Amino acid sequence: AEVNPPEAFNQDVDTYLKIFRNGRYPLDKMAVICSQTGFKLDK
């Protein structure tokens, strides 16, 4: 399913982290979302 960040990301960070950690969300897009929202991913 397609997602529409950053609004949806702000509403459900946990879901996005699960998607990201499962490798279903491109790293470059995740980096953009993080920069837009100020959210930091743990290494």
From Swiss-Prot:
Top-level taxon: Eukaryota
GO molecular function: serine-type endopeptidase inhibitor activity
Keyword Disulfide bond among UniProt keywords: yes
UniProt signal peptide: none
Keyword list, A-Z: Disulfide bond, Protease inhibitor, Serine protease inhibitor
Function: Inhibitor of chymotrypsin.
Similarity comment: family membership: Belongs to the protease inhibitor I13 (potato type I serine protease inhibitor) family.
Known partners and oligomeric status: Heterodimer of an A chain and a B chain, linked by a disulfide bond.
Name this polypeptide is given: Cytin chain A
